[in-house]
Amino acid sequence: MSDRFEYRDIRVDGDDGPIVEGFSAQIAADGLTVIVGPSGAGKTTLLRLLNRLDDPDAGQVLFEGRDVRDYDVLELRRRVQLVGQVPVTFPGTVADNVGPEATDLLAQVGLHAALATREADRLSVGEAQRMALARSLGRHPDVLALDEPTSALDTASKGGIEQLIRQLADSSLTVVMVTHEPRHATELADHVIEVTPRS
């Protein structure tokens, strides 16, 4: 299948020099692409370029063959949903957070319908991560970009989220996941992009 994204000779500058420099890679439209590497290698920065939460200082990011800067940024962010490693909850119930399709979406991410009326700030971290995924899926994205989605979870919760990510990747979604855990590349990924820190 064709590429969903292409990074072309990317450079992103930080306070102490480039965070990423001369980076090129493709993200396939099918399955799960895992971006793996140690802390400080620029993985999260690369993820944030996909929906313009950050822009490169040099180079291009192409989405379906077009520079991401050519898209309306709100439409780009609807199509490319980013879920951070710390799930964000808004005031109100789980249903308020997820939106009008809450019942179906909660079932899709493995949350019991009874949780819909619970205050979102009373969820466990694992439940909140699933809720954040449900909220993003409710935007009907083409791409789900996940930043270390299991890093704050206990072992039992990690397994459930990893299984859910794998199921989503087997649907029509493009799923991109940043991780520092090598086993995600070997056990979960269809495609792997390895990022190394600048020396």
Predicted features by range, described:
Residues N51:
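Helix-to-loop junction immediately C-terminal to a conserved catalytic motif
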Residues G59-D67, L76:
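Conserved ABC transporter NBD signature motif
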Residues A102-L115:
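Conserved ABC ATPase "signature" region
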Residues E119-L123, E127:
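Conserved ABC ATPase signature
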Residues L133:
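Hydrophobic anchor residue at the start of the ABC signature
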Residues L144-E148:
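Catalytic Walker B motif of ABC-type/P-loop ATPase nucleotide-binding domains
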Residues T179-H180:
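H-loop/switch region of ABC-family ATPase nucleotide-binding domains
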